């Protein structure tokens, strides 16, 4: 990475196109191969001894540059006519090369900003997706309203390329990227749809994740700009300028957005108690003030997506609810603010009176129904939550079968230890435990009772419930750690970088 840094600094100092030449460097594709989501796309059964060739990649790029992307052919084939090889195969290789090259300048920029902020040591904890929940526990108990927002897609591919061009000045590289994207959509759908986006994300995962995250980052940067500047804008001059290159200039070309709605309310628009969190395609906006301001932000989001990103967004994709009456779903948890009421008897001189105290607490619980649905989809139980055997694992040894189930239980327990109530988590463990026993009994062609009586595996299967407690007893001092505290308290692990496979936020 140091070599990339030196190369980029030299190229930028000469004001050259510094990304385009990297596309034709063979070591870039070797780097993509070593860091790829699925290495099998770089192996093709052919006459090249299962090795990719840079010459073939260049030939495919030449072919794409000679195509007319305004003409859609119904007979377009996935076969390259002059090579006879699978066109999708080479497209995936080029996609990985694009992803590696375009990630380099942003990775260097991120690393340098982290070094300047001196937060490298704590960066690993900040990266954890569960670091969101301590923030929610600290802030959301003082808030009243929450807005669930689902970020709309698909976005037109031309908008994606333009957004990237605002940040990196390399005309040949983005021209080639545009050719690649148009070539993909010409073979699937000229206008991006959810189906074509899903196809692109599966065949080109790394490039898709980068483009999608950059699209979200761009909309959030505009949102944060307006959030910070909204209270300083005057009544008659409030407007939104949807041009990233000259963000603070050309006031005569500012595009006024819902100025009618703001004509009498802008002086009260400042809201210091508004908080925003996001994970993947879902974000949450919470505020302490009246829902009127939340509706203003709702209309702002809709206009932003429609005017700047040309993405159609309907108002029903943004829901505003009271925190005390509504549970919002995030990262596989259901969260809501619970009101705890208590009565205190107070005495002043000879007068005695009762005082009602209302305290708020953020409840974060395990959603049992979606988890059972995920377990049923994975064939661990039926739709009612009754455990069933896993016949496809019956060919493995007893130790491997038990280890597989234990690994799933360990991961779920690790992920859901922040729950306020552990009862749902214990039910999931119980389902997996019985599914493991039934799988072993099915393998040995016996009943569950006969298998347990003959093999004495009951003590071994107790690890489903005791292993997590033993680990925590090693982390915390024994005088402070008790079984009662384990069942009652929430424990957030800050080493979780992605959601569990069984977590479903839909």
Swiss-Prot record:
UniProt entry tagged with the keyword RNA-binding: yes
GO cellular component: chloroplast
Keywords recorded for this protein, A-Z: Chloroplast, mRNA processing, Plastid, RNA-binding, tRNA processing
GO biological process: mRNA processing; RNA splicing; tRNA processing
InterPro entries in the record: Domain_X (IPR024937), Maturase_MatK (IPR002866), Maturase_MatK_N (IPR024942)
Pfam family name, one: Intron_maturas2
GO molecular function, one term: RNA binding
Known role: Usually encoded in the trnK tRNA gene intron. Probably assists in splicing its own and other chloroplast group II introns.
Protein name: Maturase K
Organism of derivation: Trifolium hybridum
Designated gene of the protein: matK
């Amino acid at each position: 990475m140091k070599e990339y840094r030196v190369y980029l600094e030299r190229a930028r100092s000469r004001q050259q196109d510094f990304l385009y030449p990297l596309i034709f460097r063979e070591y870039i594709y070797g780097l993509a191969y070593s860091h790829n989501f699925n290495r099998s796309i770089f192996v093709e059964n052919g006459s090249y001894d299962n090795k990719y060739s840079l010459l073939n990649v260049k030939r495919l790029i030449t072919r794409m540059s000679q195509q007319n992307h305004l003409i859609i052919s119904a007979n377009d084939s996935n076969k390259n006519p002059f090579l006879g090889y699978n066109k999708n195969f080479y497209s995936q290789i080029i996609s990985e090369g694009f992803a590696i090259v375009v990630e380099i300048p942003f990775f260097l920029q991120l690393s340098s900003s982290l070094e300047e902020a001196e937060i490298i040591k704590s960066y690993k904890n900040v990266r954890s997706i569960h670091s969101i929940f301590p923030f929610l526990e600290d802030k959301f108990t003082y808030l009243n309203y929450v807005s669930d927002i689902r970020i709309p897609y698909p976005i037109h591919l031309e908008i994606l390329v333009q957004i990237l061009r605002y940040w990196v000045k390399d005309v040949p590289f983005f021209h080639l990227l545009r050719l690649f994207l148009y070539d993909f959509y010409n073979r699937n759908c000229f206008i991006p749809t959810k189906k074509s986006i899903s196809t692109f994300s599966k065949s080109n995962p790394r490039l898709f994740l980068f483009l999608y995250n950059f699209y979200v980052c761009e909309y959030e940067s505009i949102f944060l700009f307006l959030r910070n500047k909204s209270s300083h804008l005057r009544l008659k001059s409030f407007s939104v300028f949807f041009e990233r290159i000259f963000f603070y200039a050309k006031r005569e070309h500012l595009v006024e957005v819902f100025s009618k709605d703001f004509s009498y309310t802008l002086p009260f628009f400042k809201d210091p108690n508004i908080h925003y969190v996001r994970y993947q395609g879902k974000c949450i906006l919470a505020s302490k003030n009246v829902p009127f301001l939340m509706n203003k932000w709702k209309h702002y989001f809709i206009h932003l997506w429609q005017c700047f990103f040309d993405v159609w967004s309907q108002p029903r994709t943004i829901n505003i609810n009271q925190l005390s009456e509504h549970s919002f779903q995030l990262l596989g948890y259901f969260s809501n603010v619970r009101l705890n009421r208590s009565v205190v008897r107070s005495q002043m001189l000879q007068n005695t009176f009762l005082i009602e105290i209302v305290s708020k607490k953020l409840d974060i619980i395990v959603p049992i129904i979606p988890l059972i649905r995920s377990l049923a989809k994975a064939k661990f139980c039926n739709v009612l939550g009754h455990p069933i055997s896993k016949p496809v694992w019956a060919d493995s040894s007893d130790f491997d079968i038990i280890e597989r189930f234990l690994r799933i239980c360990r991961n779920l327990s690790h992920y859901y230890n922040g729950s306020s109530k552990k009862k749902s988590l214990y039910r999931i463990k119980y389902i997996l435990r019985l599914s493991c026993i039934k799988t072993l009994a099915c393998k040995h062609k016996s009943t569950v009772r006969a298998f347990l009586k003959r093999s004495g595996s009951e003590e071994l299967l107790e690890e489903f419930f005791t292993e997590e407690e033993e680990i925590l007893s090693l982390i915390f001092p024994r005088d402070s750690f008790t079984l009662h505290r384990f069942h009652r308290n929430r424990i957030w692990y800050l080493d979780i970088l992605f959601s569990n496979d069984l977590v479903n936020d839909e």
